[in-house]
Amino acid sequence: KRLLQNLGIEINQVIPEGGFIEDLQNLPKAWFNFVPYREIGLMTAVYLEKEFGMPYVSITPMGIVDTAECIRQIQKHINELAVVSLEETVDYEPYIYQQTKFV
């Protein structure tokens, strides 16, 4: 959650954290699904992509390389949808640089 918040991304729904069946109706509002642990949620993310065209990111943000790649995948999905909805694109490279420059 903290990584997404640091990037300024509003979290639509965390499944199954404190969720109710009624909350599932909010799933289509997401621009992408984030699956930080492939063992939990990957099959659902694949299904949602296949059935509804909802992209997903399934890179676990652990370590410098994987965290940077995860952020770049998130950026890619946001920018693809931002172009369609005529919103501004994002550039998270400065954030990645800031987080890794002293390592």
UniProtKB/Swiss-Prot annotation:
The UniProt record lists the keyword Chloroplast: yes
Cofactor(s) the protein requires to work: [4Fe-4S] cluster
Cell compartments where the protein resides: Plastid, Chloroplast
UniProt GO BP: light-independent chlorophyll biosynthetic process; photosynthesis
Pathway(s) annotated for this protein in UniProt: Porphyrin-containing compound metabolism; chlorophyll biosynthesis (light-independent)
Keywords: 4Fe-4S, ATP-binding, Chlorophyll biosynthesis, Chloroplast, Iron, Iron-sulfur, Metal-binding, Nucleotide-binding, Oxidoreductase, Photosynthesis, Plastid
UniProt xrefs under InterPro entries: ChlB/BchB/BchZ, Nase/OxRdtase_comp1
Cofactor binding notes: Binds 1 [4Fe-4S] cluster per heterodimer. The cluster is bound at the heterodimer interface by residues from both subunits.
GO cellular component, one term: chloroplast
Enzyme category, top tier: oxidoreductase
This enzyme's EC code(s): 1.3.7.7
Catalytic activity: chlorophyllide a + oxidized 2[4Fe-4S]-[ferredoxin] + 2 ADP + 2 phosphate = protochlorophyllide a + reduced 2[4Fe-4S]-[ferredoxin] + 2 ATP + 2 H2O
One Pfam family this sequence matches: Oxidored_nitro
Gene Ontology molecular-function annotations: 4 iron, 4 sulfur cluster binding; ATP binding; metal ion binding; oxidoreductase activity
Record note on quaternary structure: Protochlorophyllide reductase is composed of three subunits; ChlL, ChlN and ChlB. Forms a heterotetramer of two ChlB and two ChlN subunits.
Family, similarity comment: Belongs to the ChlB/BchB/BchZ family.
Function comment: Component of the dark-operative protochlorophyllide reductase (DPOR) that uses Mg-ATP and reduced ferredoxin to reduce ring D of protochlorophyllide (Pchlide) to form chlorophyllide a (Chlide). This reaction is light-independent. The NB-protein (ChlN-ChlB) is the catalytic component of the complex.
Name listed for the protein in its UniProt record: Light-independent protochlorophyllide reductase subunit B
Organism (species): Spinulum annotinum (Stiff clubmoss)
Organism lineage: Eukaryota, Viridiplantae, Streptophyta, Embryophyta, Tracheophyta
Gene designation: chlB
